[in-house]
Regions:
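Membrane-embedded beta-barrel scaffold of Gram-negative outer-membrane proteins
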Residues: 277-279, 283-291, 295-303, 443-447, ...
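Gram-negative outer-membrane beta-barrel transporters
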Residues: 496-498, 514-601
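Transmembrane beta-barrel wall of Gram-negative outer-membrane proteins
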Residues: 149, 156-238, 263-281, 285
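Periplasmic plug
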Residues: 27, 34-35, 54, 65, ...
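A beta-strand signature from Gram-negative outer-membrane beta-barrel systems
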Residues: 101-151
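Conserved C-terminal beta-signal and adjacent last beta-strands/turns
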Residues: 170, 335, 359-362, 446, ...
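Surface-exposed extracellular loop regions of Gram-negative outer-membrane beta-barrel proteins
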Residues: 72, 232-247, 370-372, 409, ...
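Structural signature of Gram-negative outer-membrane beta-barrels, strongest in the C-terminal barrel
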Residues: 215-221, 337-339, 352, 356-371, ...
Length: 674
């Protein structure tokens, strides 16, 4: 909800994940969508998965641990993007499903292949990250002032309720040279599917997160600190239901579940992130960062039934299984994994001027990462990388060029009956961009970027040797930005991403070739900022056309709506500045997604397996307690989510595992800040 004492900010002053330097968003040569702390607070999402659904062009792909890569996202039609802390440190498998968004200062989504900056994702067992990166910036201790925030929200709808409590305390000490911050959340939720059907009576979702952090600044040139996070979630498993002609099929209703009462998904993790910033000279900054993230998860999940052969054709035609079956168990219905991620980087940023009017920013960064996951979810792999990037600005023009080299070492690994051999590989990922600002209100920009990542740890069909040559995703993009008001910018861009050498898998998940090809073309628009000093706005539109070039021309499977062709979101808030409603803030949001098809491993199945267009409207109002004779430090928030009760599918794994969006819910909350 919206805090009435200050208007929400939807547009950041600077962005760092696009270049590893702080740059105003209008001057970037690439597209970066940002979700600010104010935006996150208003949406009050359960986790990162729920938050990213507000960004057109991002597909969340199913909220379940019963997948090979849980917690990854599709950007611009390309799958497998794993979220990262500070643009460099991956969260690890599953974390994207459970990361509480209240911990985040902001989220920056860089559109397009970005391995030329932060490296490829090797050994994640998929053609991952070709469409962009999702970068999380956690709240951390700061030296500005003492601050305490307490917030509680309750949401109630038909067959569902949710209660959240949050606190955020920052204390400055040692004469302003040190600070400690403690952020925490707790969440209790009864989703619709545990109050009816096969899962009726299951225990609700219980989750909590604690995130202490510390910062110390002994002098003006050195600042160091540490961020930590401890997470625990125990929730009823949910994998969705089959879809047929836009509605639930196979004997299921909108808010049914195939899971049993005792099916659970449990996630635990801790993260330690020490860091140091050293301003060596006026022009030279050194940044050191590292992280250790260890997580474990386990799940038991009964899936919706799916048939084969004639029975499958019968389902395509009728939406029902001729056998009458509704449920099934598989080798993946019960699994667990221990995940370890270690990351280390040293970033040198040299920012200077030549001849008084030529600016130059040189970034050099060596880094190292190691990751492993038990249970067959990831081979132990080390990545050694180095980045070289230079940016030159003169008058109207800013030119950026960079290249990154990565060396991968994948250890020998045994999972069940599968033996993965040791492998090593190399990849070079370049990028370049330009922005031209002939007028204060007009910016032209463009970029060419390439991600090259080896595919390590894949299981192949008999006789096919493992592949270590990298797949490639190459983007060409151009656009223009207009300042339509003092703090309101309109951005328009068009892009084309071509992906080559992608592993192709059979129905069992084994690689049968390395010759996959696809193309993603699109157009995006965004309008963000302040229309007036009392009216803020964020609107985003994405058009995407995906082509599977392995399929013959003219076939439906070659050019189909794997993702919605059109997606749009609008969010706004307005603060009354006079009259009886002075300091009251009203807000609203609207999300639209056009039709798309339900797939199996990303491939077209049948025209009847589709998702219909959806329209979701949210409204909210924030009223300071001073309106009732109380303190203006306290704010009452009221809201309705999914105002018109739209029934829709918000994401899917396969055509028989589609997850329904939340029904209409009414929310009340209290927030205090002092």
């Amino acid at each position: 909800m919206v805090e009435a004492t200050a208007l929400s900010k939807y547009r950041p002053e600077t962005i760092s994940s696009g270049t590893f330097t702080d740059v105003p968003p209008e001057k970037l040569p690439c597209v970066v969508d940002t979700l600010t702390e104010d935006f996150i607070r208003e949406r009050n999402p359960t986790d990162l998965h729920d938050l990213l659904r507000y960004v057109p062009g991002i597909e969340t792909g199913g909220k379940s641990l019963l997948v090979r890569q849980p917690g990854t996202f599709s950007v611009r039609g390309m799958g497998g993007t794993e979220p990262m802390f500070d643009g460099m440190m991956p969260l690890g498998r599953g974390a994207g499903l459970f990361m509480d968004s209240f911990l985040l200062d902001r989220v920056e989504i860089v559109k397009g292949p970005i391995a030329g900056l932060n490296g490829g994702s090797g050994a994640v067992q998929n053609a991952s990250g070709g469409g962009g990166s999702v970068n999380l910036y956690m709240k951390g201790a700061h030296l500005e002032d003492d601050e305490t925030i307490i917030q509680g929200n309750t949401s109630i709808g038909r067959h569902t309720q949710r209660h959240r409590g949050m606190f955020d305390v920052n204390e400055v000490f040692l004469d302003g040279k040190a600070a400690f911050r403690f952020v925490g959340t707790s969440d209790y939720c009864e989703p619709t599917y545990i109050n009816q059907g096969a899962q009726k009576g299951a225990r609700p979702r219980e989750s909590f997160t604690l995130a202490p952090s510390f910062v110390f600044e002994p002098d003006d040139d050195i600042r160091f600190g540490v961020k930590t996070m401890f997470q625990y979630t125990d929730q009823p498993s949910y994998i969705g239901v089959p879809v047929w002609k836009g509605r639930p099929a196979g004997g299921f209703g909108w808010y049914d579940s195939s899971c049993r009462r005792g099916d659970r998904s449990v996630y635990e993790s801790f993260m330690v992130n020490p860091w140091l910033d050293w301003q060596v000279t006026e022009d030279w900054l050194l940044k050191f960062g590292s992280s250790i993230l260890v997580s474990s998860w386990s799940q038991t999940t009964r899936e919706p039934y799916t048939g084969k052969g004639a029975e499958l054709e019968h389902f395509f035609a009728t939406g029902e299984w001729s056998s009458g079956n509704r449920y099934m168990l598989s080798d993946f219905s019960e699994s667990k994994s221990l995940n370890r991620n270690y990351n280390l980087y040293l970033r040198s940023v040299y920012d200077t001027k030549f001849f008084e009017d030529i600016g130059n920013v040189l970034v050099i960064q060596p880094d190292y990462s190691y990751r492993e996951a038990t249970g067959g979810f990831g081979t132990p792999t080390s990545r050694y990388g180095v980045l070289l990037q230079d940016s030159v600005s003169w008058g109207w023009f800013s030119v950026l060029g960079g290249v990154r080299y990565d060396h991968f070492e994948s250890e020998a690994y045994t999972s069940g009956k599968n033996r993965i051999r040791h492998a090593s590989a190399d990849a070079v990922s370049p990028r370049g961009g330009i922005s031209v600002q002939p007028l204060d209100w007009l910016v032209f920009f463009g970029n060419v970027s390439q991600t090259r990542t080896p595919m390590l740890g894949l299981r192949t069909v008999n006789g096919l040797p493992p592949q270590t040559d990298p797949w490639e995703a190459t983007q060409m993009e151009g656009g223009v930005r207009f300042k339509t008001a003092e703090k309101l910018w309109l951005s328009l861009s068009a892009y084309r991403i071509a992906q080559e050498n992608v592993p192709q898998v059979d129905n069992t998940g084994l690689v049968e070739s390395y010759e996959g090809r696809s193309t993603s073309r699109g157009f995006e628009a965004s309008l963000s900022g302040e229309i007036t000093e009392d009216w803020t706005f964020l609107g985003m539109y994405a058009f995407n056309r995906y082509t599977d070039r392995d399929e013959p021309p003219g076939s439906k499977a070659r050019d189909f709506e794997r993702y919605p062709r059109h997606a749009f979101s609008l969010n706004t808030s307005y603060r009354f500045s006079s009259g009886i409603l002075e300091d009251v803030v009203i807000g609203g949001g609207y999300r639209f997604r056009s039709m798309s098809y339900a797939c199996m491993r990303g491939t077209f199945q049948n025209k009847n397996l589709r998702f219909d267009p959806s329209h979701v409207v949210d409204v909210n109002i924030s009223i300071p307690f001073s309106k009732f004779g109380g303190s203006d430090e306290w704010v009452l928030t009221l809201g309705i989510r999914n105002l018109f009760g739209e029934k829709y599918f918000e994401s899917s794994r396969h055509y028989y595992e589609c997850l329904a969006g939340e029904p209409r819910t009414f929310e009340i909350g209290i927030r205090a800040k002092w």
